[in-house]
Amino acid sequence: MPPRLVADKHEIKRIRTYINGLDENVQGVIPEGHITLISGAAGTMKSSITFNVLYHEAVNGSNGLYISLEQSAESLLNHMTNMDYDFSKINLVVVKDLAELSAKMQVINRSKGSIFIVDVGCVRKEIRDIQTDNNKSWLNVIKNVIKKVSVESNTRVFVLDSLSALYVLSRFENPRIELFMIFEFLRDMNITSFLISEMPLDGSKFSEYEIEDFLADAIIVLKLTPFRRQVVREISVVKMRTTACNNDIFSLEFKNGQFYALYGGQNPLL
């Protein structure tokens, strides 16, 4: 479904990142239905900030989908538990067998928001009838999961962890065409999407093929920056369509269960 034409900018609905200090600097943040690249090297908290969006949306009554292609659901959730997320406030549905997806969606408490975590790594171990040399099979599996969960549970937000793993799994023969079709599929689903992208340490590019940079509606970059013999996590919004945004670099901190973007455009106070 293509985005409708709005008569006034206040008609544009937005999804927060729930990062204090960042949302206020990007016009309330991401327009609904947009696709955002979350780019960063290892250890920059890409998975954490995307899960943070899903969690707070679920606390507010919305549903979200997290598809992990490599990291196990247990590893992800143990990490989030250590960050003090309270899962009693939401429905947390872990799917390791796609045959159980419909049944698990039917028994959730409708008075709460939900996070559906599909552990594709586990599914890959169990499924034997998908040809691993067919670059379309796993991509179609992932699309079908997104479509099913989105339609049947009215999912508002989707996270793919990660694009890099998808490229290994699906081996794109013509990245420009195939990536265009993936991005258009997500837009047709009218779901706000966060696509995690592995970035080299030198920050020389935001994505594997660099085509993603142009197809995405927004790019949020996370970095680890040495500063006075300490390492500072940093966050910046490189681009965001339909949004007046501050492109300054902020320090990214997590404390007392909340993310904070601090010292935008300034040296961090260390």
How would you name each of these model-derived features?
Residues I191-G257:
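Phosphate-binding/switch region of NTP-binding enzymes
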Residues A41-G43, L69-S72, L92-D97, C122, ...:
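Short, ordered loop/turn segments at secondary-structure junctions
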Residues N25-D97:
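Walker A/P-loop NTP-binding active-site region of P-loop NTPases
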Residues P2-K9, M240-L270:
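C-terminal regions of RecA-like/P-loop NTPase motor modules
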Residues M1-G33, S39:
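Extreme N-terminal, non-catalytic leader segments
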Residues I67-R156:
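Conserved inter-motif catalytic segment of the P-loop NTP-binding fold
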Residues T36, L65-I67, F116-V118, F194, ...:
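Hydrophobic/aromatic beta-strand patches that form the interior of the parallel beta-sheet core
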Residues I130-F214:
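P-loop NTPase motor core
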